[in-house]
Amino acid sequence: MSAKEGSSHPSYAEIVREHAPEQTAAEKAAPQPPEVEEVLSEEPYQKNEKVVVLDEEDADAFLHPEEAEAKKESEKPSDGEKKGKTEKLEKEAKSVYSKACNFVNAHKVPASAAISINLLSLGAISAYLLKSRQSGTLNNRTLCTCTAIAGIVFTISAVFSKTPKTACCASKKSNKST
């Protein structure tokens, strides 16, 4: 039986030894693998340990704080440079935002098409649920899935249906004209 006291079941290694075929000469000549002992870590187990992944610059700053501080001080811009950078970033953000508004508005469909899509999808979901109910396969999972699909369809149609220009897009266009 096993080497452990009180164990009524043989170990996996013992079962393999009992049912293994005879070893060949080459197998007998091969060195035996080292015995593995169970070693428990002496450090306490940390269940909710969080790992933080740093990018290369942050990792360098963490490993070499003196160099990072010297680099930061040498890179400090003057007030004029700060103002220029801020204006440049604001201008770039405005152009990106206006491009995003134009892209979204260009790919929208008329409200009548969105309503038709909603009705069509709602009808298909209702037909599926009715068929499931009649066949006796309707369950909570099916209901939840169909509810989620309906919510997704309605959300997508709301996003991609034409509506009056939003205040933020209109304000951006009025800022361009001034």
UniProtKB/Swiss-Prot annotation:
Q: Which GO terms describe its cellular component?
A: cytosol; mitochondrial outer membrane; mitochondrion; nucleus
Location of the region described as Disordered in the Swiss-Prot/TrEMBL record: 1-89
The annotated regions of Basic and acidic residues compositional bias extend over: 44-53, 61-89
Query: Single Gene Ontology BP term?
Result: protein targeting to mitochondrion
User: Superkingdom of the source?
Assistant: Eukaryota
Name under which the protein is recorded: Uncharacterized protein C11C11.06c
Look up and give the organism this protein is from: Schizosaccharomyces pombe (strain 972 / ATCC 24843) (Fission yeast)
